[in-house]
Amino acid sequence: MYKRQEKDWGKDDFTKIPNGCAGIENMYPYMLSAANEGKITFNKAVELCSYNPAKIFGCDAKGAIEVGKDADIVIYDPTKDFTITNDKMHSDCDHTIWEGIKVKGYPEATYSRGKLVFKDGEFLGERGWGKFIKRSSSGNL
């Protein structure tokens, strides 16, 4: 993720422009909104946002609710209307390219390894809660 001033680094030399844009925080709301609209299935949204990334990056304890895997889960309200605005973002980025976009459905709570870390728009995680995840060698879908 980048702040606007960091994008200015490349104004005289495009090779200095940081790649990408901020937005990972909005991935689930967008995908779940698409599922609400019937554009994709809810199972496909989970596959694209959880299962496939875990497989691609070799994170064997992630991506599915199964015995022996980390207890990571998002509780989702499919009826909640939400407008994406920068002031509702939790990252250090100073803008969102999706400012003002309305989505149907929004995460209500998130559990990481069985511990509540997000509820009703508020991040509750503690510093140091994250842990290094050693990748497996597979990384295949």
Residue ranges, per PLM feature:
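Short, positively charged
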Residues: 41-44, 85-91, 139-140
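Hydrophobic aliphatic residue packing
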Residues: 1-2, 117
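Short, solvent-exposed cationic patches
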Residues: 132-141
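C-terminal cap of metal-dependent C-N hydrolases
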Residues: 8-19, 70-131
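Generic alpha-helical secondary structure signal
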Residues: 32-34, 46, 102, 115, ...
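His/Asp/Glu-enriched, well-ordered alpha-helical/loop segment
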Residues: 3-79
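Generic detector of leucine side chains in alpha-helical contexts
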Residues: 32, 48, 113-116, 124, ...
